């Protein structure tokens, strides 16, 4: 074992021990639950003023998931019908993106270490999701989230080389050896290419102008890449723009980046198998031009555990989570 890996191991043990013991405050905001959506891990906010929300009970991987709509004006939750799917379609949604009129959904198989993954493309029309395409590629090995460049192009994160590999997870957590990557895919050409690798559990993506932002959950960093103007399969000028422990989903809205985080990975892992074990959550607003990072939410886990996605609309926060069956809606200040 190299000296740098030994030093990283000792540092990691100290950091994770401190974070496990650290206490987090309960959110002071007035919040209430939007119930009835199992594991609302990711969402997109449409210009029509509604959310499309992924739903899957991740404590029961055999179960299938759904997509729900949520209207903040009426406070109404509605399951979205899906049509044109083949029989026994493995609809277990993860990260999503929306490029009108299409919803792009990462899907997985029914085990934690599944090798079956796809990107399903649905047309969202008359409040129905119509499956148009189901894209698979050998370089999509452990997908977490995606962001579209055009109707047929997207970037997608592979958080590991082998999904749910405890060996890779241990080496990333305690030795600083990273296995994650970002791939560029062109569905029209049936083409994918790895455009960045050796990332520590790359999670989510956002595009602002020609800049690609990526959160790395186990590196605790937000990176910015420049997208080559002539070839989107080339990323240049990798730069760290923020340090956020356990960063999860990124949403770009109203000229700001909104990012949730899991400051204690150990408590997150406990919560993944036991809903009674709280997993604290933090969230931030980042200016993509100046990189100014402002905390906007903190909770010990009493109001919401393992918060995975957040957006600020006026003076309200809307928050999703990985496991428990509700969104959280909070009024700030």
Report residues per predicted region.
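A short helix->beta-strand "capping" segment at the edge of beta-propeller domains
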Residues: 22-38, 294, 298
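Beta-rich, blade/repeat-based domains predominating
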Residues: 37-47, 63, 85-100, 137-154, ...
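Beta-propeller blade signature
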Residues: 65-72, 117-124, 175-186, 278-288
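Blade-loop segments of beta-propeller domains
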Residues: 66-99, 107-109
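Short loop/turn segments that connect beta-strands within beta-propeller blades
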Residues: 71-75, 124-127, 186-189, 227-230, ...
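Asp-box/WD-like beta-propeller blade repeats and closely related beta-sheet repeat scaffolds
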Residues: 90-92, 106-149
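Loop/turn-rich, solvent-exposed surfaces of beta-rich toroidal or solenoidal domains
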Residues: 244-288, 292-294
